[in-house]
Structure formats: structure tokens, C-alpha cells
A protein has these predicted regions:
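Positively charged, amphipathic and often flexible ligand-engagement surfaces
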Residues: 1-307
Length: 307
């Protein structure tokens, strides 16, 4: 019930406007968001790199309502890719299509993301653009664009997708992405979806996560296993060892500010780790979804917000 409430709040525009303007809201966000500026995000990336972990930078925002907002967001990502190369960071970027104007003009969104992929592909060394997955109304269009971009000359290995294990269609989508040689980030999913589209029971979501993890690890393609769930991590490690899959052939991924102890423990044990670092002023929907994924985070925030 609490999870459903938090997801509902993540979509509430008046609550979002109030929270993003409040000092208390901003303080709450700092646990999971690196800051509001590019420089703050890059500083966080450098700090994480020093701990032996890679980074994926996300300029927070979604469902922009005009072309100018979409172009401004793309400019931020262009700058990020430039700064990553200049500062020699172990970092890539994660992009939402609705932040690139998918709701406004699909052609524009395609053009802007294509420009980011081209920038990443021309880097020295080449970089990588992860196209984030959003709610189910966007699933097919998102995957179609990833496939389209991946097929373009020079883009192989530069653009990747995200699969959510709570989606019933997940296995079918994984099979198609693997057949095309596309890199995948596997997560559980954090949007409210109806039963005909998504598994509702945690046990079903977890079982599908393990099943899809095994498919990814056996593929020979470099993927990201994104989870903070110790049982999912243990299942991935056990399968990798059973199949003699080397640690450098995939990476675990976790969110900024969550289970830092576990992140560092896995690195010490020889596993690769990438931390997803969000930043920007539009942090409210992201924060609410993180709290919905793990309501215990809400208690943590309330205990620490006034310290």
C-alpha cells in the first residue's frame, strides 16, 4: 500500500512543484541525488571513480512539454560526454526519451539521441549511451529506437537498453536485444503497471530477474546487473562461478546513495561496479520512485533529515 502511495505521489504535479521548491525537500533529495549542477555531478563521479567504481550520469527530467526543453537537456548531455572525455572519467550517460522530447515530437527525440550516440561513438575512448526505460506506454517505442540506433554504422556497442524484470514481456525483449548484440541493464522496475502488463508479486518479479540474469550472463555480451537485493546478487555470482563466467565480463550496478557498503564490498571481492548518479533540479519523481522501491529508505530519510 505504501509503495502504491509513493508511486502515486511521484506522478502528482502539485506535490512535485511544492517539494522541488522547498528546502526540506532539497535536503531529502541529497541522499540519492548528487546535486543540481553538472559540476556537482562530475565531482561525485570523480569521487566514485576513486573508489574503483564506474559511473552512469543521469540529468534528471522526463515528459518535457516543448522542443526547447528537449534541446536544452540534450545540450547538457553533450557537455557531460565532453567533460567525461576531458577529465578521463570512467563514466557513461543514461537518457530518458521523454526528456529528449518523445511526447512532443518523436522525430526530434530520435535526432537528439542520435546526436548523443554519435558524440559518444566519436570519443577517445568511445563512450556509451544507455537509453533508460520508462513506463509501459513507452516500452515499444524505446526499444524500437535502441534497435534502430544500434543498426546504424559505427553505433554497435555505443547504445544500450534497459529491461525491467516485472514486465511480462521482458524475456521476449531480452531475446531480441541479445540477438542484435545490444547491451542491457537489467532492473526490477519502479512504475505502477496493471497485472496484465507486469507481475504484481515480488516472488514473480524476483524469479524473472534471476531467469533474465542467467540469459544475460550466458550471452557473452557485456551487461549490467542492476540491483541492491543481496539474493539477486548472490544468484548472479553463483551462476557466474558455476558457468566460469569471468568477473570482467559483466558489471553490477547500484544507485547513488544506496548500499554504499555493499558496493565497496563487491569491488573488494573483484566484481565490477557502476554507480548510477542522478543530478538536476527535477529530482522529485526520481526520489519518490526510489522510496517506493524500498520504503525503508523513507524511514532513513526521516531520521536523518533534521540532523
Amino acid at each position: 500500500m505504501l509503495r502504491a502511495l509513493l508511486i502515486h505521489l511521484s506522478e502528482n504535479r502539485p506535490m512535485r512543484a511544492m517539494a522541488e521548491r522547498s528546502i526540506v525537500g532539497l535536503r531529502m533529495s541529497r541522499r540519492f541525488v548528487a546535486g543540481t549542477t553538472v559540476e556537482e555531478a562530475l565531482a561525485a563521479a570523480q569521487a566514485v571513480n576513486r573508489l574503483g567504481m564506474g559511473v552512469s550520469l543521469d540529468n534528471l527530467g522526463e515528459n518535457v512539454t516543448n522542443a526547447e526543453e528537449a534541446r536544452q537537456s540534450a545540450q547538457v548531455y553533450q557537455r557531460l560526454l565532453h567533460e567525461i572525455e576531458e577529465r578521463k572519467l570512467q563514466a557513461n550517460v543514461s537518457v530518458k526519451l521523454t526528456h529528449m522530447g518523445l511526447d512532443v515530437d518523436e522525430k526530434l527525440a530520435r535526432e537528439l539521441v542520435s546526436g548523443l550516440v554519435a558524440k559518444a561513438g566519436n570519443g577517445h575512448p568511445r563512450n556509451f549511451v544507455r537509453v533508460d526505460m520508462e513506463g509501459s506506454p513507452y516500452t515499444q517505442r524505446t526499444l524500437d529506437l535502441v534497435h534502430e540506433l544500434h543498426r546504424q554504422p559505427g553505433n554497435a556497442g555505443v547504445v544500450g537498453a534497459v529491461i525491467q524484470s516485472y514486465m511480462r514481456r521482458g524475456e521476449q525483449d531480452v531475446e531480441k536485444l541479445l540477438a542484435a548484440g545490444i547491451r542491457i541493464r537489467l532492473c526490477k522496475g519502479a512504475y505502477k503497471e496493471p497485472p496484465e502488463i507486469a507481475y504484481q508479486k515480488k516472488s514473480e518479479v524476483d524469479a524473472n530477474y534471476v531467469k533474465l540474469t542467467k540469459m544475460l550472463l550466458k550471452s557473452g555480451i557485456y551487461h549490467g546487473i542492476a540491483t541492491h537485493d543481496p539474493r539477486m546478487i548472490e544468484a548472479a555470482i553463483a551462476f557466474a562461478r558455476q558457468e566460469r563466467i569471468p568477473p570482467q565480463s559483466f558489471e553490477f550496478q547500484m544507485l547513488y546513495g544506496i548500499r554504499r557498503d555493499l558496493q565497496q564490498k563487491l569491488v573488494r571481492e573483484g566484481w565490477r561496479m557502476r554507480v548510477y548518479i542522478p543530478f538536476g533540479t527535477e529530482w522529485y519523481p526520481y526520489l519518490m520512485r526510489r522510496l517506493a522501491e524500498r520504503p525503508a529508505n523513507l524511514l532513513f530519510l526521516m531520521k536523518n533529515i533534521f540532523r
